[in-house]
Regions:
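C-terminal outer-membrane/trafficking sorting elements
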Residues: 558-562, 566-582
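Extended ligand-binding clefts on enzyme/binding-domain cores
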Residues: 214-225, 236-359
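Hydrophobic core segments within long, regular secondary-structure runs in both alpha-
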Residues: 40-51, 90, 104-122, 145, ...
Length: 582
């Protein structure tokens, strides 16, 4: 080899040694340019509040009662149960985990608290206390009858929200999961458990757990047996399993389908096909279309015993669209666009009016952001700023939430949780969580040991292109500002390759703890770290933490007939879908 060739080889070797450093400094520029995803201050404030809410012990058993910050008041009679606060509070946590995939310990901790509470007496309160027909069904007020009761069944029909456990043909069923009905309990439980697994990276609920039943009984399940049971029920009932006895809610089934979607993505199964078959089978019965194919009405609930669809105008479809977006984006967007047009939200010359409560608008705002509908999003966002009463509260103003001018001590749980959906992530984030979940994060460098909420994490992101972990920390703990603390980074390919910058300067105050982990000194302050780890995710995620068994579901090409009875209600008085007027 000539001297020139030797020089060329030496230069190439030299540049190879410089490449990681060049990538590292280039990555700092990318960090400052805003490419790295980040949680905003409101999201961190809400996260801090959820952390306090979930980690404060309370008693959801037969002998206790949830603390008053758990929402048991919103949207009676159908949603005024504490378990709906558990489910609604989980959604934004999944989005947060995708913004900071390298830091998940607090999300997992909160979701564990939500899951544990969902197994209790108070989570299944309606199923465990509402036996037989509603003794007050002869005394419903007129506005209640107009909204909820089929015209030909007045005086002999139970209102939505009354589960009627024990009526024929099902009889008394003590197990809230094993029951033929109670879909809204088991469907949302699986969804929350999936989000917990998605943040923790372990098959936690694959181990047996106990769920509270009638008369202090307990029933043993795993998440996998729950999903198998739910899927079997759905296959056997093409209209969908019911929530209250006799009532099938497409709203609840869409949420249950979302849980199956994420379950399949994590565990590599095929249970979600029942959702698509259900949509196609029931579309002609549950939705009303005019001769040109335009949407005229959408379902509230369906009673297969009397073949009755209880329906509202197109605007009601927003409640279904929110859950359907990751599963059937085309039909979901059709429901959304029709609803926003009917409501006039896309008309800049028309004011936004919706009352007496704001849950519906929070769902619309989340959908607008998801679809990238900038006109509707900006209009609803402005309305929310004026009417949702967003504010900071608690010690050092550490917590954030929406109070909705209700003059209550805490943010109204269900509504406030939905309102936070528009604060987290970018366009398409809700769909991406379920359609393209980030599972490789479990093998990537991971931040832990953060003294949350006194020290908060706004960014924790592994950039595969430059092998760098970006971390942004902040603190609102006035009593600890600038005091020393430490954090840990695990799942490192080789700790000996580590190079660290703190706020742009080389940083050496760190040490190797064990084979694949380092400990890093920091302070309670606003700090940015760029940590070159060399991780590039060159190999596909192995799913080593999860089962890979597959199940199949036979196809169903049937289509349902029109219902014998349809009641189209004026939902202007509806506490669940307020003042839609269409």
């Amino acid at each position: 080899m000539s001297d020139g060739e030797n020089l060329f080889v030496d230069l190439m070797a030299f540049f190879q040694t410089l490449l990681p450093i060049c990538k590292f400094f280039y990555s700092i520029v990318r960090m400052s340019s805003g490419v790295i995803p980040k949680l905003n201050s409101r999201t961190l404030g809400w996260l801090s509040y959820l952390h306090k809410k979930c980690l404060t012990e309370d008693d959801w058993s037969e002998d206790g009662e949830p603390l008053d910050w758990w929402d048991k008041s919103s949207n009676p009679p159908v949603l005024s149960f504490a378990r709906f606060d558990l489910s609604e509070s989980s959604y934004a946590l999944g989005l947060m985990a995708d913004v900071t995939p390298a830091w998940r310990e607090v999300y997992s901790e909160i979701l564990n608290g939500l899951c544990e509470r969902h197994l209790t007496y108070w989570a299944a309160y309606d199923w465990l206390t509402q036996f037989g027909h509603d003794p007050d069904r002869n005394n419903y007020p007129k506005e209640w009858i107009d909204l909820w009761i089929p015209d030909h069944k007045i005086g002999e029909y139970d209102t939505p929200g009354w589960v009627a456990n024990g009526i024929e043909p099902w009889g008394l069923q003590a197990d809230p999961i094993g029951a033929d009905g109670n879909l809204f309990f088991k469907g949302w439980l699986n969804l929350i458990q999936c989000l917990h697994v998605y943040t923790k990276g372990e098959d936690t609920w694959g181990q047996p757990f106990q769920v509270a039943g009638v008369d202090r009984t307990r029933f043993e399940w795993t998440q996998h047996t729950l999903v198998s049971h739910l899927t079997s029920q759905w296959q056997e009932n093409p209209f969908g399993p019911h929530c209250e006895n006799t009532k099938i809610w497409p709203y609840c089934l869409s949420a249950a389908g979302l849980g199956l979607k994420l379950y399949d993505s994590i565990f590599h199964k095929e249970s979600h096909s029942v959702f698509h078959e259900w949509v196609e089978f029931t579309k002609g019965k549950y939705y009303g279309f005019d001769a040109s194919g335009g949407l005229e009405w959408t379902p509230i609930y369906y009673d297969p015993i009397i073949d009755h669809v209880h329906a509202a105008g197109p605007s009601n479809g927003l409640t279904i669209a929110f859950y359907m977006i990751p599963q059937d984006p085309i039909f979901a967007e059709y429901l959304y666009r029709t609803a926003t047009k009917k409501l006039g939200w896309d008309n800049t010359k028309k004011g936004i009016k919706i009352k007496p409560n704001l849950r519906f608008l929070a769902l619309g705002l989340a959908c607008a952001k998801e679809f990238g509908d900038l006109i509707v999003e900006s209009r609803l966002k402005a309305f929310a700023e004026e009417n949702f009463e967003p504010r900071w509260f608690g010690k050092d103003n550490m917590y954030f939430g929406h109070f909705f001018n209700l003059k209550e001590n805490w943010p109204r749980g269900q509504w406030a949780a939905l309102a936070m959906m528009s604060e987290v992530g970018e366009k398409g984030a809700w769909s991406n969580l379920f359609r393209n979940p980030n599972l490789e994060k479990f093998d990537a460098p991971t931040l832990s040991g953060v003294d949350f909420p006194d020290l908060m994490v706004s960014s924790a992101y592994n950039n595969k292109r430059d092998g760098t972990l970006y971390i942004a920390l902040t603190s609102q703990a006035l009593g600890k500002l600038n005091k020393r603390t430490s954090i840990k980074i695990s799942n490192l390919p080789d700790p000996n390759l580590i190079k660290i910058k703190r706020d742009g300067a080389t940083y050496d105050s760190w040490r190797i703890n064990q084979k694949n982990e380092i400990e890093l000194d920091t302070t309670y302050s606003t700090t940015n770290f760029q940590i070159y780890t060399g991780w590039s995710a060159t190999e596909a995620y192995s799913s080593r933490k999860f089962k890979t068994l597959k199940t199949s579901v036979e196809g169903n090409n049937r289509v349902s007939a029109k219902a014998s009875s349809v009641k189209l209600v004026n939902v202007s008085c509806c506490p669940c879908c307020p003042s839609l007027g269409t």
